[in-house]
Amino acid sequence: MFNLLLDFDGTLFDTESGHEAAYLETFAHFNLGPCPSYESLKGIKTREVFDRYQSIHYNTDEMAQYKSSAYQAGLSAVKAFVDLNLLNQLRVKGVGLYIVTGGSRKSIEGLLNLHQAKDLFNGIVCAEDYYRSKPDPEPFLHCIRQYAVTGEIHGVEDSVQGIQSVRAARLRAIGVHNSEVEKLADAYYPSINTYLSELIER
């Protein structure tokens, strides 16, 4: 059995601008000071980001909910990086497809439903399902345990934290879309679709 454990934001869907705008709006609304670069926040749970800014005036849940609502407002504008037809071909060939993300289940399933893509995946692991964020291996290890994934497993990621998480889980790390991860990954593809096409043909 061959399996792909796929990151979501920046790997399957072009969500970066939406998340970045939502973080900027939230930091401004709560007067939290300069917002960190989105690159440094990739793969980290939203709650963990705002844990650092909790105060007597605002709590983590309040800030995380505001950010989530700001992101949800622009969900319909998010485009797919991945060719969903390629994922469907892999599924037909018997490849196991799993999402492993630091995003909330509401955001992930909302976007998948908009693209009628939820049924392509054998399982989805979201921020609510584990304790330690990427670069810790827990998100990927949790997916393997939760869905009893066996056989050859590749982890596909676009961020440094994500690739580190895959490697810490002792999986083959496939980097996509971000040249910063090329030196860390076992293999790198500028487009996830090139990688998926290779898998279909092999």
Positions of PLM-derived features:
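N-terminal helical cap/lid subdomain that shapes the substrate entry/recognition surface
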Residues: F2-L84, Q89-K93
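Short, flexible loop segments at the rims of nucleotide/cofactor-binding pockets, characterized by
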Residues: A73-V78, G102, Y131-R132
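Substrate-recognition element of Asp-dependent hydrolases with the DxDx(T/V) motif
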Residues: N85-N113, V166
